[in-house]
Amino acid sequence: HFMLPENPRPIPSRFSLDPQIKRECIWAGPHYRPASLLVDRDGPMIRARSERKWDVLAQHIPNFDSLFDQVGSLRSSPEVFQMREFIRRWRFYDHFRSDADAAVRQPQLGTRTPVLHHDGRDLAAALQTIIEIGDADAMRAAITDAFPGARLHIESQAGGRFAIEFFQEGLLRPLSAAELSDGTLRYLLLVAALLTPRPPSLMVLNEPETSLHPDLLPALAR
């Protein structure tokens, strides 16, 4: 429960218009009921149900901090811990940069990447991770479905950097990420996001059709 400050007196802060957190609740079941309440943050105090009594976990929480920032150990408040970890696994891909200066167009340090970065900069590592521990067949099928005869290779360069090599029918050499069209690059980014070896409970893709050729949309949907 968020709301603006109710104090009629002037607040000596430049952040006086920030919303304040008044109430946070974690409960069991599909609907809130007082009897199903497990963790309750009311104003500055956080309490958790312990059998038939309530344990106070914190008493002086700033009104701009969530209970997830203040408590949440597996031992003292497992409900907060589990809910926080559940939310942390959500993925939001608002915008993949594909301009000439975008990091995804340059070789990047290659480390195991089961989750694509929100801006896609670690695309090469994410694709290689799918090849090694994910559904490599689905990835190859998604690429050939959109680009018949095409194939992908991740090149290991000096210094541990990974680079994308995209082979297409009719071309004598592979294309680097810097040479790919915006649509092709965005398609590969979406494939890497959707075929993650660690699928989240919630994934949000903002306007995934942006910059994609209409012919690629059926392949993306499949």
Regions found by a protein language model. Give the residues of each.
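ABC-family P-loop ATPase nucleotide-binding domains
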Residues: 133-157
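Switch/communication elements of ASCE P-loop NTPase nucleotide-binding domains
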Residues: 149-152, 156-222
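Electropositive, glycine-dotted interaction segments
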Residues: 1-137, 141
